[in-house]
């Protein structure tokens, strides 16, 4: 242990920004699993492979890719437009259409044949990752890809990029703001939305970095939001270590060339904002 109380490892850690290395971990790519069932809200688009299985009195398997105009071709029936439909919607629609050539499919009370529509190979989408990432650009991704996977492909968030205000723009409108800390701290993946063709991910610069040192479990730098308090910072840092004096702490705030020093009592931790 060094004279200043830190080990060499702790000294290196306290200069790091918490969460920034999540996209640098080789074994954590956030790549979508090909073995999962198709999400119920997944919408078919050009390039998706549609598999139609029919069994019972009638038996057939039909496979086709959705064309650029959003259709598949079914022998003896012609073009069927599926673009924008979920698998459930496509299943219902195809049941009625295929009943024209396979009798008994659309008899809900006692169908003599059954139909099941599944997704084969999924399409590739183009997504733009812009702003404070190491490798901004346009990426070809699986249509199951999420924001986190796109950020991983772009090399992760840069040294001045925000982990907590990542914006997703679709059709010129901001549709989501992603906070990586919600995933790291709480395991929440609600904000890690599935991407669509033409989506833009924008990583702006961070607004505030706060360094916490001394007897806490994770002495590091943390990106803080405007409404977060000292209590939140302590929570991010894992709380006080066993030998810490917990009744008060000292905060140094830089204002231009001047430094302001505050002593904060424990009763004010939840109201004093960084």
Descriptions of predicted regions:
Residues 1-274:
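Ser/Thr/Pro/Gly-biased, low-complexity, turn-/loop-rich segments
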């Amino acid at each position: 242990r060094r004279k200043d109380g830190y080990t060499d490892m702790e000294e290196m850690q306290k200069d790091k920004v918490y969460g920034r290395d999540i996209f640098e971990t080789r074994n954590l790519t956030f790549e979508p699993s090909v073995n999962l069932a198709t999400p119920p809200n997944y919408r078919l688009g050009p390039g998706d492979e549609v598999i139609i299985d029919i069994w019972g009195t009638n038996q057939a398997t039909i496979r086709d890719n959705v064309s650029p105009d959003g259709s598949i071709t079914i022998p003896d029936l012609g073009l069927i437009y599926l673009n924008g439909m979920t698998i459930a919607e496509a299943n219902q629609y195809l049941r009625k259409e295929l009943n024209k050539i396979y009798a008994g499919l659309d008899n809900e009370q006692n169908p003599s044949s059954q139909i099941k529509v599944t997704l084969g190979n999924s399409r590739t989408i183009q997504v733009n990752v812009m702003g404070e990432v190491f490798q901004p650009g346009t990426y070809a991704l699986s249509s199951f890809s999420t924001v986190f996977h796109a950020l991983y492909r772009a090399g992760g968030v840069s040294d001045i990029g925000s982990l907590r205000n990542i914006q997703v723009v679709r059709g010129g409108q901001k549709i989501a703001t992603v906070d990586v800390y919600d995933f790291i701290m709480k395991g929440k993946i609600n904000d890690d939305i599935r991407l669509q063709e033409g989506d833009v991910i924008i990583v702006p610069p961070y607004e505030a970095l706060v360094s916490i040192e001394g007897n806490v479990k994770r002495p590091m730098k943390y990106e803080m939001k405007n409404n977060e308090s000292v209590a939140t910072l302590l929570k991010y840092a894992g709380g006080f270590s066993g030998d810490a004096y917990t009744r008060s702490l000292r905060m140094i705030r830089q204002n231009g060339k001047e430094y302001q020093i505050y002593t904060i009592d424990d009763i004010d931790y939840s109201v004093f904002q960084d």
